[in-house]
Amino acid sequence: MDKVAKRYIERYQKAKAFREQWVPLFEECYEYALPQRESFYYEEHGQRRDDKIFDETAVVGVQEFASRLQSGIVPNYARWADLISGSEIPPEQREAIDNELDEVTEYVFEVLQNSNFSQEIHESFMDLAVGTGILCVEEGDSLNPVNFSAIPLPHVVLDTGPDDRIDHVFRERKKVKFDHLPLMFPKGTFDNKVTSQMGANRETTVLEIVCRDYSTKNEEAYLHYAICM
């Protein structure tokens, strides 16, 4: 196994072991407040998770929490942010630059409103009610330039860096077909062990990592890895 891949897998396993201490508490929160979301434990498809709910207070409360966050921060069909020139821009140039940035902002929100952002951010806010919300933003195509997906918390493991801020996000994706890897990671490189499994309808587990690149000074840069485990 590649040394870089081995290092990240070891870090993931260590972070996951630390998270396991909190899984029973998270699972109980999900059972009472978010029974429709995926469990931290293995379950069969279609298995009921609402047998412990005798009062709808928590379930309704989470829905209202997510709706209020969405309407207050990122309301549907509204321009909730603007791109404007910063303080380093000379005053005599700001008006012209602001006009150009206004066109960029208009295009950005046109893309957002025609995407699945509203639906996915709502699910992410529901996860935020009991823990951490994770919203994955991926490059799309000419029809859908940007794709959003709210990643269920059971799929994600977080780790912190030297400043106690989250600098590693691990996502374990199970039952991924080898044939789908070139479509999922068009810029990826695949060794012979991976390519030899393609075309045989075989599956693998993929560990995705988004991590801070500390080698880049004076800039908040991140790296994206995908490892077949």
Residue map of PLM features:
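Extended, helix-rich architectural segments
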Residues: 1-205, 211-221
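Catalytic nucleotidyl-transfer cores of nucleotide-processing enzymes
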Residues: 224-229
